[in-house]
């Protein structure tokens, strides 16, 4: 039988939905030579903002 360990859910992760602009969008990002450009066509479901669909 393996020893039990204590897990704290509040360390490093909080459940919930965050605004896309606050978590992923970085307007001042400077591209590098090693960056890869990929393009995808996304169609949001009714009631979902386009920026949240991707």
Curated annotation (Swiss-Prot):
The modification N6,N6,N6-trimethyllysine is found at residue 14. Its main location: plastid. GO terms for molecular function: monooxygenase activity; ribulose-bisphosphate carboxylase activity. It comes from Ilex aquifolium (English holly). RuBisCO catalyzes two reactions: the carboxylation of D-ribulose 1,5-bisphosphate, the primary event in carbon dioxide fixation, as well as the oxidative fragmentation of the pentose substrate in the photorespiration process. Both reactions occur simultaneously and in competition at the same active site. It catalyses: 2 (2R)-3-phosphoglycerate + 2 H(+) = D-ribulose 1,5-bisphosphate + CO2 + H2O; D-ribulose 1,5-bisphosphate + O2 = 2-phosphoglycolate + (2R)-3-phosphoglycerate + 2 H(+). Residues 1-2 form a propeptide. Heterohexadecamer of 8 large chains and 8 small chains. InterPro entries: RuBisCO, RuBisCO_lsu_fd_N, RuBisCO_lsu_N_sf. One of its GO terms (biological process) is reductive pentose-phosphate cycle. Its EC number is 4.1.1.39. This is Ribulose bisphosphate carboxylase large chain. It is found in: Plastid, Chloroplast. Keywords: Acetylation, Calvin cycle, Carbon dioxide fixation, Chloroplast, Lyase, Methylation, Monooxygenase, Oxidoreductase, Photorespiration, Photosynthesis, Plastid. Belongs to the RuBisCO large chain family. Type I subfamily. GO terms for cellular component: chloroplast. It comes from the Eukaryota. The modification N-acetylproline is found at residue 3. It is an enzyme of class 4 (lyase). The basic functional RuBisCO is composed of a large chain homodimer in a 'head-to-tail' conformation. In form I RuBisCO this homodimer is arranged in a barrel-like tetramer with the small subunits forming a tetrameric 'cap' on each end of the 'barrel'. The keyword Plastid applies.
